[in-house]
């Protein structure tokens, strides 16, 4: 609880608080959803995550909540060693949505509780990294430049896909 109070104090002093979780690790007890198909159905964790986010939001002047980032099935630097079409085939948007259902449900509930709050925004990285069918872990198939440093952290190139939205929120 002490760390929440520290976050709260820092958030009160900041123009903008950006909050991002490793939802897969917290809700599923696993670093990457590709490594475990079994979800932890722990309702208390979901409730606690919702309460923590709302607590930090209530301390913040303005807040951006970053949704779950699609996990890459491979460590970013190794992407050049695999067949790109195989990687793309194993990373559907449907798979991402299924594995992140709990986190997306929590974010949806938070969004519903804040729909009239102009100082609260949600950025869903999958909207920038996925099309209607699949999520991309490379810039394009002709230029296999990875969008990730590892399995869950975006590289500079990957981050550029969402940082413009964050910058526009800073300017509002």
What residue spans do the PLM features occupy?
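Extracellular glycan-modifying ectodomains
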Residues: 1-172
């Amino acid at each position: 609880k002490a760390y929440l109070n520290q976050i709260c104090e820092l958030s009160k002093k900041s123009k903008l608080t950006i909050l991002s979780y490793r939802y897969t690790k917290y809700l599923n007890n696993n670093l990457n959803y590709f490594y475990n198909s079994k979800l932890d159905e722990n309702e208390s964790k979901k409730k606690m995550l919702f309460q923590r986010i709302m607590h930090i939001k209530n301390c913040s002047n303005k807040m951006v909540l970053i949704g779950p980032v699609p996990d890459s099935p491979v460590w970013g630097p190794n992407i050049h060693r695999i067949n790109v079409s195989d990687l793309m085939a194993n990373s559907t948007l449907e798979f991402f949505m299924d594995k992140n259902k709990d986190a997306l449900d929590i974010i949806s509930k938070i969004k519903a509780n804040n729909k009239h709050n102009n100082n609260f925004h949600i950025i869903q990285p999958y909207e920038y990294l996925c099309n209607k069918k699949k999520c991309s872990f490379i810039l394009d198939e002709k230029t296999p430049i990875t969008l990730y440093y590892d399995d869950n952290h975006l590289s500079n190139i990957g981050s550029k896909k969402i940082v413009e939205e964050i910058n526009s929120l800073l300017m509002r």
